[in-house]
Amino acid sequence: MSSDSTGHIFTPGRVRPVAKVLVATTAMLAFISFWRAAAIVLNDLASSAYYAGGEAEQFIGKTAPWFILGIMLFSYAVRAIYVESCSMFVRGGVYRVVKEALGGTLAKFSVSALMFDYVLTGPISGVSAGQYLVGVLNELFVYAHIPIHLYVNGTAAAVAIAITLYFWWENVKGVPESSGKALRIMQLTTIMVIVLISWCFYTLYARSGWHLPPAPLPQNMKLDKGSLGWLDRYQWAHTITLIAIFVGLGHSVLAMSGEESLAQVYREIEHPKLPNLKKAGLIIFIYSLVFTSLVSFFAVMIIPDNVRGKFTENLIGGLSMHLVGSFPVRLAFHVFVVVVGVLILAGAVNTAIVGSNGVLNRVSEDGVLTDWFRHPHARFGTTHRIINMVVAFQIITILASRGDVTFLGNLYAFGVIWSFAMKGIAVLVLRYTHPQDREYRVPLNPVIFGVEIPIGLGLITLVLFAIAVINLFTKPDATMAGITFTLILFTVFEISEHRMHKRQAGAAHVELDQFNLAQEAELTPTSVGVAPGSILVPVSTYYALYHLEAALKRVKGLDAEIVVLHVRMLRRAASGEYDLDPDQLFSTIEQLLFTKVLAIAEKEGKPVRLAVAAANNLWEGILRTAMNLQSSTIVSGSSSKMPVTEQAREIGLAWERMPEPRPRLALEIFTPVGQEYIFYLGPHAPRLTPKEIDVLHKMWLKFSEKLPGEELHHHDIIHFALTELEREIAEGQGDEVLERLRQHLREIQTRRLNPPVEPKNLPAKPN
């Protein structure tokens, strides 16, 4: 006989009563500064500078830099749409919010176009990285007189596949994204940009005869079958200036790819969120305007017309090799440009996988995709099926492109512009359906006869749709591929949603327990129903509940208070600015997880409390929950990605990032074979081994004999040793101390025993 999470008694032979699951509606977030937020977005947005200018010039000729500049200026207006979207107080994912605005059919098309965007981001970034890498390697081979010449497109495709597979495995393992890494990459990129722009200006100063690109007028543009596509047969497409301008903008829209990343990082930006979001947006605008547009202008002004065509897919590399200066210096800078480019472009490949995974997880949370897609990996607990599917699409795309960036750019432009256009129309409709639920509005909203007219938002959306429609006709291959992909994904969504509704309308799974979802803003001892000093057991996947079994076996009686917590990770994804509803946080995956939790609790005859919370950093979310619940102990399973000591170090770093006052907690980590490791979070007395205590006692005896009449305690010896160590470091002997410590650790490594284990009964309350 045992009790459920609310105190009911489990009696063999009768149906288990409905257990309560407390869902925290306020997400526990680890916040970042607007500088880091800008760096994350720029890692995605700046990658387009490596290929956008060259791709635009291939289609519309030497006027391309003006259109790139126009797109970069227009991007600030598009960014205002995302700022307004972030400021809205609405709940639901990428599908649910758009469905409310546009209806189910258009919402599915919107998500399908967005997925086309994400699926293409990886291949074009990976292939572009390969193009730059192959270009510099071939130049190095020539310079070193090595008789090797790499086939550019084929090798670029191989590099792209290698990068994609690397990040596929990283995402399957669940390696978290790092804002610090993004910031360091952008710092390195900034150095490269400053050197490049300064060197370009000096080159123009040193050379005479340079001139600006021709004005963006029809007579100066290359308007042919390649740039006009299906419109080439109509004479008006060659002569009407407005049409020509939209054609040019359509071929330059790749320069704006990555804008959607701003909304993805919104929830992570520190308070005050909206002002900091605007600051991040301004930084992104200035940086991308200077970098992307100036690269395009300098390429036309510095690289001779007769050779520039060779560098359309390696534009910055070609620019670096045509600056003034000696060849070795230019080649060295070219290598630096490529290293930075590969870092940025490879990061964009990872962003594409993370973003696609986030979007499809959101769609699954919205009830469109079945929970089969969100099935957790048996070892890592990640949504590996979604990741596998996305990466498979990306590798197929890379193989189909055969390393041709132009082919990929055409496809990518389809997804980019249509995802922007659908976002614009959704925010425009939400302006009327949720008129008060926002802190910010896109400017130009005159009130006529008491009715607000969103002129600014409407004009931006109209321009986006005009470019999108023009692109349908000027990029026939991309149109056919994009429509085919969108229809396939739309069909998958339609069938999957139908199955989900049918399942929800029918009988519940007989093998799954039913749960009563209770909502609270935060998890507290009162809301969960536990006293201070509880034991917090985080669980992520039903494949790994051995640590819960260990905790339940060790508690005494029925008065032990164990809280089982499942943290729903909030990924960076489209419409990530919208909070999830409680029912989206608790799907069939969580239902199955807690069903198994209750089965284990019933087997052990011990009660548990069940809770779900959302967070964007796993351990910071768990630690904040432990602090809110005033827990005394966290019991965790060992990580499948790192050793236990490294896992404990990561948790300790997360503890250090918490605001004061930080809770003092015992951390118990169990391995699948039952081995236990105990760590303490926060300052604590060290647990000395018997041998260490014996050494300390012998030293005390020796010093007591040498210092008769002095009051000497064991702790005085420890204090003296620490003070001497601190003095040596202060006197500049830190490196020597570090080396002695390293040598000591190596000497004891082979005989180091497992950490001593605490008494076998975990206290339900602090002693």
Regions found by a protein language model. Give the residues of each.
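Extracellular loop-to-transmembrane helix junctions
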Residues: 53-113, 123-163, 287-293
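A generic transmembrane alpha-helix motif of multi-pass inner-membrane proteins
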Residues: 404, 409, 416, 448-502
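Structured cytosolic domains appended to multi-pass membrane proteins
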Residues: 510-676
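TM-loop-TM module centered on a large, flexible mid-protein loop between adjacent transmembrane helices
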Residues: 103, 139, 222-231, 280-348, ...
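Hydrophobic alpha-helical segments and their helix-loop junctions in multi-pass secondary transporters
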Residues: 190-229, 297-305, 423-439, 494-506
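Membrane-interface "cap" regions at the ends of multi-pass membrane proteins
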Residues: 1-52, 87, 96-100, 104-105, ...
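C-terminal membrane-solvent junction of multi-pass transporters and transport-like membrane proteins
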Residues: 181, 372-385, 423-472, 476, ...
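Loop-to-transmembrane helix boundary motifs in multi-pass membrane proteins
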Residues: 104-107, 149-161, 268-292, 361-399, ...
